[in-house]
Regions:
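Non-catalytic signal-transmission and effector/linker regions of two-component phosphorelay proteins
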Residues: 1-32, 93-94, 106-121
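His-Asp phosphorelay/catalytic-motif detector in bacterial-type signaling
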Residues: 23, 67, 93-101
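Short beta-strand elements of ligand-binding domains
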Residues: 30, 74, 99-105
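Acidic, metal-coordinating helix/loop segments flanking the phosphotransfer/catalytic sites
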Residues: 52-70
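Short amphipathic alpha-helix used as the core "switch/output" element in two-component signaling
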Residues: 61, 83-96
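Conserved phosphotransfer microenvironments
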Residues: 73-89, 105, 109-112
């Protein structure tokens, strides 16, 4: 599979309609392609819209452009550390309001996302 096909498969979204526009958008930031794809599928299967980033720089750009409702960060982001990326997002007025959740192994992803989504209501 080419890099473009992989990125296209990873950047999935619920079907566009008047109803889906209001669905929460989650940005998954993770350098591991299999992890990004797995988490993306978990969330889209539950109705979330999803976009993905592979690096800290890409996370900052996509967060600024798409203004997701939540950013999930896992592992290393390659060019920037998770801490540096989070700090830059927190300092930017356009992205400072977006919750950032750092994922850790052993916890169920969807449970944590649903908990954050419920708390935001």
């Amino acid at each position: 599979m080419s890099e473009l096909q992989t990125l296209t498969a990873e950047t999935t979204a619920a079907p566009t309609s008047a109803v889906s526009i209001a669905l929460p958008l989650v940005l998954i930031a993770d350098a591991d392609p299999q992890s990004r794809l797995r988490r993306s599928r978990q969330l889209t299967d539950r109705g979330f819209r999803v976009t993905v980033a592979r690096t800290g720089f890409e996370t900052i750009v996509k967060a600024s452009c798409h203004l997701p409702d939540l950013i999930l960060v896992d592992g290393s982001l390659g060019d920037r550390g998770v801490q540096e990326t989070s700090e830059l997002l927190s300092r930017c007025p356009a992205t400072a309001h977006i919750p950032i959740v750092r994922l850790s192994p052993g916890r169920r992803l969807t449970s944590r996302v649903l908990a954050v989504a419920s708390a935001a209501r």
